[in-house]
A protein has these predicted regions:
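FAD-binding beta-loop-beta segment adjacent to the flavin cofactor pocket
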Residues: 197-200, 255-275, 284, 334-340, ...
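Long, low-complexity C-terminal extensions of enzymes
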Residues: 294, 298-399
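N-terminal FAD cofactor-binding segment of flavoenzymes
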Residues: 20, 24-80
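Beta1/beta-strand and adjacent pyrophosphate-binding region of the FAD-binding site
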Residues: 2-17, 37
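Predominantly flavin-linked oxidoreductase catalytic cores and closely associated redox partners
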Residues: 24, 28, 106, 110-247, ...
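Short hydrophobic core segments
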Residues: 10-12, 39, 140-153, 272-273, ...
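Flavin-binding catalytic cores
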Residues: 223-253, 270-273, 295-319
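A conserved beta-strand/loop capping segment in the N-terminal third of enzymes
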Residues: 56-119, 123-130
Length: 399
């Protein structure tokens, strides 16, 4: 590497996408004389306040970080309940601390090729043609390529009147009881038998054993709510579903995920690539991101390694296909125009669509046949009407 550069690649942010890309670069054969620097504003990297969940549909580098698998998944709507499973498919979770532990172990074994710079904030990136200037709170760093995983501000969904902009926001707690009250093999993905007064709302439950579970209150609305709203919803759900049971709170977690039809500018300049949420790797209609990030870095990392060998640029693969963008646009447009229909619509999806097909659809790994099955067996007439209403959006998103 030429002395004029502080790094071959600088990654702004050491979260899910930043660490996943760094690991993927090693797997792709990052040269021994190359240098990758991850810059993160946190003093200590820890994922104790988050988990990533997904259907285990594609292989990835963090299989050993999976701590729980559920062979069945449930959706409730009022008194109605649908319970589903699919051969060879589980719903999985990776706790944030396990992900960080595994990723950091891999990076530490890479020696001088990987460096973590903590307690430093990346302020902005400037493509200078032959290199990138990374402006930070500690000064300017120079790199051949820069990857920007800094998430957008999500205190409120922007609304320009054209695109659909919602937020998936949640707060949850891990609770434990002395009594065995949870079904350890069944994840409750959506329980809509809760108040809908503040917008589309459901409870999400991941039992880790018969005594312990993560219980989250989740909303699809334009802005997050006070913590007390989520906490009250969890208390109400626990009291109604498990009356008389005393719970101890072990930990809390919260988050905000964009659900938007706005396009993401993932390649703002030849030497700067946006990744993760900033790169559009979150599926707008479901909020799932883990598998999308893993698919992206697995395809992108070899391009970066090849670019470094010739001092070139690396074009990122498309985060999502035109087909899936179109389907999410229709679905989000429908949720915006008919939020009161959301519980029935989601319930029908899980009730009518074959579980393996729906798992692939929700994870953006489905085929055209899968997508047609979902459209044909879901709330078809209303979604067809929404497709007509969303036509101007579709033209802008898919051209």
């Amino acid at each position: 590497m030429r002395p004029a550069f502080d790094a071959d690649v600088i990654i702004a942010g050491a979260g899910l996408s930043g660490l996943s890309l760094a690991v993927a670069l090693l797997d792709a054969g990052l040269p021994e004389d190359a240098r990758v620097v991850l810059v993160d504003p946190r003093e200590t990297l820890s994922g104790a306040d988050r988990t990533w969940c997904f259907f285990d549909l594609v292989p990835h580098a963090f299989e050993s970080a999976i701590t729980h698998r559920w062979s069945r998944w449930r959706v409730r709507n009022g008194a109605a309940e649908v319970l589903r499973s699919a051969p060879g498919i589980s719903y999985c979770t990776i706790p944030g601390e396990r992900f960080y532990e595994l990723a950091l172990e891999r990076l530490a074994a890479a020696g001088q090729r990987i460096e973590l710079v903590l307690g430093v904030t990346v302020e902005h990136l400037e493509d200078r043609g032959a290199h990138v200037d990374v402006h930070t709170s500690a000064g300017v760093l120079r790199a051949r390529l820069a990857m920007d995983s800094r998430p957008p501000s999500l205190t409120r969904a922007a609304d320009d009147g054209n695109d659909v902009n919602l937020l998936q926001h949640f707060r949850g707690r891990v609770v434990r009881s002395t009594e065995p009250v949870f079904e350890a093999d069944t994840a409750t993905l959506m329980d809509f038998d809760v108040s809908q007064a503040d917008g589309i709302h459901f409870i999400y439950v991941l039992p880790f054993d018969a005594h312990t579970a993560l219980v989250e209150s989740t909303f699809f609305t334009e802005r997050p709510l006070p913590d007390a709203v989520y906490e009250a919803a969890i208390d109400t759900w626990l009291t109604r579903r498990l009356p008389g049971v005393v719970f101890q709170t072990i930990s809390h977690e919260s988050g905000v995920i964009p659900m938007t039809t706005e396009p993401f500018d993932a390649w703002p300049s030849p030497r700067i690539v946006r990744i993760g949420t900033a790169g559009g790797h979150v599926k707008p209609s479901s909020g799932y991101a883990f598998l999308a990030v893993q698919r992206f870095v697995r395809e992108f990392a070899p391009r970066v390694v090849s670019a470094l060998r010739v001092d070139g640029c690396a074009e990122p693969p498309a985060a999502r296909s035109r087909r899936t963008i179109a389907l999410d646009t229709i679905f989000l447009s429908y949720l915006r125009s008919r939020p009161e229909r959301a519980p029935d619509t989601f319930y029908r999806l899980f009730e009518r669509v074959p579980p393996a097909v729906l798992a692939r659809f929700l994870s953006d790994t489905g085929t055209l046949a899968d997508d047609l099955t979902v459209m044909r067996t879901s709330d078809s007439p209303r979604l067809a009407l929404e497709a007509i209403r969303a036509t101007p959006l579709l033209r802008r998103k898919t051209r």
